[in-house]
Amino acid sequence: MDLAKFNFEPSVITDFMQSAIIDIGDELQLCVEVGGNPDHPPLLLIMGLGSQLVFWPDSFVKGLIDAGFFVIRFDNRDIGLSSKIARPFPRFPINNVKMMLRMQVGLTNRHFPVAYNLFDMVEDTRRLLDKLALKNVYVVGASMGGMIAQILAAKYPKRVSTLGLMFTSNNKPFLPPTKPKQLQTLLSHPKTTQIDDVVAYGVWCMQRIGSPNHVDEREVERLIRLRFERSYHPRGALQHLQAILATGSIVKFDQKIKQPTIIIHGEKDGLVPSAHGRAIAKAIAHSEFHLIKDMGHDLAKPFIPTIVKLLADHYMKHA
């Protein structure tokens, strides 16, 4: 990949990465960071709901680079430094709880007037690969990013060589729902939009969804402040949630996936219980499932070396 073509400059947040704003068409721009040797196998990271690219821990990204990958990470639409979707609010507010309940029992939410769905976000990702002239990549998605990755692998099998899915779901009906303690994080918000309240809320959320006894509050606070300074856009997180709910079950896409697939899930994940990861493993032929003891819905520091090794070994086994 010719980095000079895209005006990449040293990242202001991670010293071993380079950053650029890339126009992918349809008046959309994505903030993209790359790191490692461009001649090495490309690995694309897709992050989850409302989470900027900074939420990929530096040690995780560096571990993948050291394992021999050229790593690409980006802000999804509506978050971070990527384009925001400024669609007018619908006349009647969307009932997110109603959408959650409908998806849980397999009812469609496609009639709800959401700003976009996961299929639109898949096209963002595919167009980014086109723009970067990356014909075939190892795709690793976390949470909502894992849902995007599943659809991408099924719709564009020639673009995805290998698939890594972390603490994600295929939203199959009647899977165990989000636990009440973690559900609060999806239905609440900071007291105000002042930075101290936003940071306190972010720490509160991670204490509930993260790995028990392994949440580094100081690091979480640093990341929340960084996210706030880059771009504070809570509507983007809301529209990400609605994109998931409007899309619904993606089991039919899992059944089309033929690429080697590894699924990694935390034993203590209350936001997306591990049964969701097992459901993906059951739906994707010849996939492998790994349950990480004591891990929640995050990439906590103690688990990063294990996860990096699992992802790297999986690629090498099928290269």
Which residues are covered by each model-predicted region?
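Conserved acidic catalytic loop of the alpha/beta-hydrolase fold
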Residues: 106-107, 119-137
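Conserved hydrolase catalytic core segment
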Residues: 135-174
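N-terminal cap/lid segment of alpha/beta-hydrolase-fold proteins
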Residues: 3-29
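Conserved alpha/beta-hydrolase "acid-adjacent" motif
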Residues: 270-276
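Alpha/beta-hydrolase
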Residues: 178-252, 259
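Catalytic active-site module of serine/aspartate enzymes centered on a nucleophile-bearing elbow/loop
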Residues: 287-319
